[in-house]
C-alpha cells in the first residue's frame, strides 16, 4: 500500500508546479500623501469584471435577433443593477449561509478583496435587478431573464477558473490521474472540482442554452430559457458537490447534503415551474 501511494503521488498534478498565482498584476509600492500603498489586482476580481463585460456584450448580440424584449440602450441600467446585485447578493448570502460569524464584526462584510461570494446569492441579486429594470422601464422581466440566462454561463466559467487559480474550493480526495495536490489542502490528491464546475456550469450550459435560443422556439416562451438556466446550474452544482470538499465550518448537513446542494433544490424547483408554465406565455414575433 505505501508503494502504491508513492507511485500515485508521482502521477498526480502538483498545484505549485503549475506556476499559478492569485495575483494577476502587482502594481508595486506607491507613496501618496504620506500613505504607503501596495495595490494588487487579483485574477478573481478580473474574472468578475471580464465576465460581466463579456456577458453584457453577448446580451447586446442576442438583442440583435428578431423579437428583442428591450432596447440595446436599456442594457446600461441592467448591467449597473445586475453588477450591484451580484456583489451585494453574493456577499450577503455567503455571510448568512456559509460564514455567519462575520456578522459579529459587520465591517468584515465589506472586505470583498478577501474573497467569499455565493453564486446562489449573486443570482438572487441579478433577478432582483431584472425586476427593478423591468418595473422602471415597463418590460417583461421573464424575457429579460431569458437573455441574461443565455449569457450568465460566461461569468460562471471565468469565476470557476479563478477559483482554480486561487487554489480554493478544491475537491474531495481522489485517485484519478488528473487529481491535484493543493498546497492548502494537505498532501492528498484531490478532484479539481473547480474545473468540473467550469465545464458543466460554463461550457455545457452555455452551449445548451444558446442552442435552445437559436435552434428552437424557446425564446418565444418567456421564462423557458431562464428555467433551463436554473435547472442546468442547479443540477450541475448538485452533481459537482459530490466531488467537492464540503465547507470546513459546515461540513455535510444533518440530512446528508451540503449547503451548496441544499440551496440548489429551490432553484431547480423554480426552474422546472418556469419551463412547465412557459407554453402558456407563448408570444409571436
UniProtKB/Swiss-Prot annotation:
Signal sequence annotation: none
GO function term, MF aspect, one: phosphatidylglycerol-prolipoprotein diacylglyceryl transferase activity
UniProt xrefs under PROSITE patterns: LGT
Domain of life: Bacteria
Keywords: Cell inner membrane, Cell membrane, Membrane, Transferase, Transmembrane, Transmembrane helix
Residues that hold a 1,2-diacyl-sn-glycero-3-phospho-(1'-sn-glycerol) according to the record: 160
Record flagged with keyword Cell membrane: yes
Cell compartment(s), UniProt: Cell inner membrane
Segments crossing the lipid bilayer: 17-37, 43-63, 78-98, 113-133, 139-159, 195-215, 223-243, 256-276
A Pfam family recorded for this sequence: LGT
GO terms under cellular component: plasma membrane
Pathway assigned in UniProt: Protein modification; lipoprotein biosynthesis (diacylglyceryl transfer)
Enzyme class: transferase
Membrane-related topology note: Multi-pass membrane protein
EC number, UniProt record: 2.5.1.145
GO biological process terms held by the UniProt record: lipoprotein biosynthetic process
HAMAP family: Lgt (MF_01147)
Family statement: Belongs to the Lgt family.
Main function: Catalyzes the transfer of the diacylglyceryl group from phosphatidylglycerol to the sulfhydryl group of the N-terminal cysteine of a prolipoprotein, the first step in the formation of mature lipoproteins.
Name of the protein this chain belongs to: Phosphatidylglycerol--prolipoprotein diacylglyceryl transferase
Organism: Zymomonas mobilis subsp. mobilis (strain ATCC 31821 / ZM4 / CP4)
